Amino acid sequence: MTTDLKKTPLYQNYVDSGAKIVEFGGWAMPVQFSSIKEEHNAVRYNVGLFDVSHMGEIEISGKDAEQFIQYILSNDTNLLTNDKAMYSALCNDEGGIIDDLVTYKLNENHYLLIVNAANTNKDYQWIKKHSSNFTVDVSNTSDKYGQLAIQGPHSRALINELVDIDVSHMAMFEFKQNVQIFGKSIILSQSGYTGEDGFEIYCKQEDTKDIWEQLLEYDVTPCGLGARDTLRLEAGLPLHGQDLSESITPYEGGIAFAAKPLIENHFIGKSVLKAQKENGSERRTVGLELLGKGIARTGYDVLDENSNEIGFVTSGTQSPSSGKSIALAIIDRDAFEMGKKVIVQIRKRQVEAKIVKKNQIEK
């Protein structure tokens, strides 16, 4: 592994625990601590803890911040409040997804954007470039934050014990600022990337190690990127760079709920997304379950029963929960029918599959 990879504040903890470390988005990250299946099941049935400090943070502040946020994001940012976050897309003029991200409104003129690690610098430069006509300050503050995700059906009860507020009724994407945990001040968000109940903790970078170590004193399993990927794929949640890209729109990528092109305010990519909203997109994302042996890898062709190409696999794995071979794929809209049999071209073999719901969590 090259030595110029970025490291989170927990890198030495990975090394000391014997975690398997890999390169991901320019970072040295743990792919697993024990086994992917063990970590996956900990999140599905108990509590797992992820270091996601590699994610990027971009802050936008100033008199025109509210107006600018709507200009660059595809969702209706008028619905943002000081305690409610929002999932959205940063789109180009063609409606393609530069990145998918979560936005926190810290106050009337101050927003925090959480972006994908590999896209942080690209996003920052793009946002900065488009800010010239607005009175805003755009800052890449990724070095300021640590981020941990505590996920699983028992995570809420545990967090409720450890923080100074009642989280028992916190709804999805609700967040609170200046929450205390282990004597540290954090932003606590009811969110995650696993398909389970859970929370994300944003802390000062220098507090990350202490919070991580104290959380692990409870019945919590440290988890790596391997389980994060199988969990999100079972839940049908997209990964930018595979399921989403600059040539895939929110309507094609299965995140139509994050696009609101019928709102009055203009945003970049709105005209293309409005046409897709009104007329339908030519492609759509589906779930696949393979009926034969093999894993559907990113880029494999999807064919109809007459061997005509109708799309391609964006992500695939063997589900640790069900043992089934599952995938996400983008196919032609006209080829879609729930339960329909299709073929995945796995190297020289053709493997039968069927179209299913994107969320394939089985317990």
Curated annotation (Swiss-Prot):
Catalysed reactions, semicolon-separated: N(6)-[(R)-S(8)-aminomethyldihydrolipoyl]-L-lysyl-[protein] + (6S)-5,6,7,8-tetrahydrofolate = N(6)-[(R)-dihydrolipoyl]-L-lysyl-[protein] + (6R)-5,10-methylene-5,6,7,8-tetrahydrofolate + NH4(+)
Pfam families per record: GCV_T, GCV_T_C
Molecular function via GO: aminomethyltransferase activity; transaminase activity
One Gene Ontology term, aspect cellular component: glycine cleavage complex
Keyword Aminoacyl-tRNA synthetase part of the UniProt annotation: no
InterPro entries named in the record: GCS_T (IPR006223), GCS_T_bac (IPR022903), GCST_C (IPR013977), GCV_T_N (IPR006222), GcvT/YgfZ/DmdA (IPR028896), GcvT/YgfZ_C (IPR029043), TrmE/GcvT_dom1 (IPR027266)
Keywords: Aminotransferase, Transferase
EC number: 2.1.2.10
GO biological process: glycine decarboxylation via glycine cleavage system
Role noted for this protein: The glycine cleavage system catalyzes the degradation of glycine.
Protein family membership: Belongs to the GcvT family.
Quaternary structure note: The glycine cleavage system is composed of four proteins: P, T, L and H.
Name this protein carries in UniProt: Aminomethyltransferase
Lineage: Bacteria, Bacillati, Bacillota, Bacilli, Bacillales
